[in-house]
Amino acid sequence: MSYVKAKSNTAFSPMRDPIDRRPLHIGIVLLVGGQSKRMGCNKQLLPWRGKTVLDAVCGALHCGWNDSVELTESCKLPFVAVTGDDHERLEPIVTSYGFEVVQNEHPNRGQGLSIAIGVRHLVENSPIPLDGILCSVGDQPLLTGNVVHQVISAFSDNFHSKTIVVPHYGANYQSGN
């Protein structure tokens, strides 16, 4: 069982009330540029239930997003995967789930740069104006569409211009990715 706790910081927000537009338009930035130094191989490419770990994550993100967001006429999804050194091996997997792909040429600079690259790409290229962006890492094979749906729902239910939703899990409500 998972628990989603919504965090909202509106102290400096010009908006005092939640936006009344429903459904909200949510994009996804998938971080798949990790170097897997401790593991010694790319975790996202490991086998998982007949496919790869990355297939499981992409499937969960796609399923949870589809359950949460009303599709528009555009067939281009507001999804981007940010790759690193394994770009050529990861690209065919993520594109099969509707993700555009951009490569972080400097993955050693960390996730922050990959997030910035992904967010910039979505803001500049999304087929629809976005109200929020869900960021995920690509090595969580136990991620489910239901958890993704809960995170998006918590965001939608608590939306202000500076809403941040942090998923929590376990008895101690540890922060998740």
Residue ranges and their predicted role:
Residues 177:
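Conserved beta strand-loop-helix elements of the APE1-like EEP
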Residues 1-24:
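Eukaryotic N-terminal low-complexity, Ser/Thr- and Lys/Arg-rich leader segments
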Residues 18-174:
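Nucleotide and nucleotide-moiety/phosphate-recognizing core
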